[in-house]
Amino acid sequence: MSKFLIKLITLYQKWISPLKGQTCRFYPTCSSYSISAYNTYGFFRGTYLTIRRLLKCHPFHPGGFDPLK
Protein backbone atom coordinates (compact mmCIF):
# COMPACT_ATOMS: atom_id res chain seq x y z
CA MET A 1 0.00 0.00 0.00
CA SER A 2 2.87 2.40 0.77
CA LYS A 3 4.36 1.89 -2.70
CA PHE A 4 1.02 2.75 -4.31
CA LEU A 5 0.75 5.98 -2.28
CA ILE A 6 4.34 6.89 -3.13
CA LYS A 7 3.50 6.45 -6.83
CA LEU A 8 0.46 8.74 -6.42
CA ILE A 9 2.54 11.39 -4.64
CA THR A 10 5.22 11.15 -7.35
CA LEU A 11 2.54 11.68 -10.02
CA TYR A 12 1.31 14.69 -8.07
CA GLN A 13 4.86 16.09 -7.90
CA LYS A 14 5.40 15.58 -11.62
CA TRP A 15 2.07 16.72 -13.09
CA ILE A 16 0.04 18.80 -10.62
CA SER A 17 2.57 20.58 -8.43
CA PRO A 18 4.28 22.44 -11.33
CA LEU A 19 0.90 23.90 -12.32
CA LYS A 20 0.26 25.23 -8.81
CA GLY A 21 3.68 26.75 -8.30
CA GLN A 22 5.64 26.60 -5.09
CA THR A 23 3.05 26.89 -2.32
CA CYS A 24 4.40 24.69 0.47
CA ARG A 25 5.61 26.67 3.46
CA PHE A 26 7.87 23.88 4.70
CA TYR A 27 11.23 22.42 3.74
CA PRO A 28 11.23 19.64 2.71
CA THR A 29 7.93 20.04 0.88
CA CYS A 30 4.92 18.17 2.23
CA SER A 31 4.99 15.70 -0.67
CA SER A 32 8.71 14.94 -0.18
CA TYR A 33 8.12 14.60 3.56
CA SER A 34 5.30 12.16 2.82
CA ILE A 35 7.44 9.98 0.58
CA SER A 36 10.17 9.89 3.23
CA ALA A 37 7.63 9.00 5.93
CA TYR A 38 6.24 6.09 3.90
CA ASN A 39 9.72 4.81 3.02
CA THR A 40 10.95 5.07 6.61
CA TYR A 41 7.93 4.06 8.68
CA GLY A 42 5.57 2.15 6.39
CA PHE A 43 1.89 2.65 5.72
CA PHE A 44 0.29 3.30 9.13
CA ARG A 45 2.86 5.56 10.78
CA GLY A 46 3.66 7.18 7.43
CA THR A 47 -0.01 8.05 6.97
CA TYR A 48 -0.21 9.45 10.50
CA LEU A 49 2.87 11.63 9.97
CA THR A 50 1.62 12.79 6.56
CA ILE A 51 -1.78 13.82 7.92
CA ARG A 52 -0.16 15.59 10.86
CA ARG A 53 2.12 17.51 8.49
CA LEU A 54 -0.71 18.45 6.11
CA LEU A 55 -2.78 19.79 9.00
CA LYS A 56 0.10 22.18 9.82
CA CYS A 57 0.34 23.44 6.24
CA HIS A 58 -1.87 26.54 6.38
CA PRO A 59 -1.36 30.32 6.22
CA PHE A 60 -1.32 30.78 10.01
CA HIS A 61 1.59 28.38 10.62
CA PRO A 62 5.06 29.89 10.16
CA GLY A 63 6.42 26.85 8.29
CA GLY A 64 10.19 26.57 7.88
CA PHE A 65 12.55 23.62 8.24
CA ASP A 66 10.63 20.55 9.45
CA PRO A 67 12.56 17.33 8.74
CA LEU A 68 11.28 13.82 9.31
CA LYS A 69 12.37 12.62 12.74
From Swiss-Prot:
| InterPro entries referenced in this protein's UniProt entry, alphabetically | Membr_insert_effic_factor_YidD (IPR002696)
Q: How does it sit in the membrane?
A: Peripheral membrane protein
- Give the record's family classification: Belongs to the UPF0161 family.
The superkingdom listed in its UniProt entry is: Bacteria
Tell me what organism the protein belongs to: Alkaliphilus metalliredigens (strain QYMF)
Q: What does the protein in this record do?
A: Could be involved in insertion of integral membrane proteins into the membrane.
Q: Where in the cell is it found?
A: Cell membrane
Assigned keywords, A-Z: Cell membrane, Membrane
PANTHER family (alphabetical): MEMBRANE PROTEIN INSERTION EFFICIENCY FACTOR-RELATED
Q: Which GO terms describe its cellular component?
A: plasma membrane
Name used for this protein in its record? Putative membrane protein insertion efficiency factor
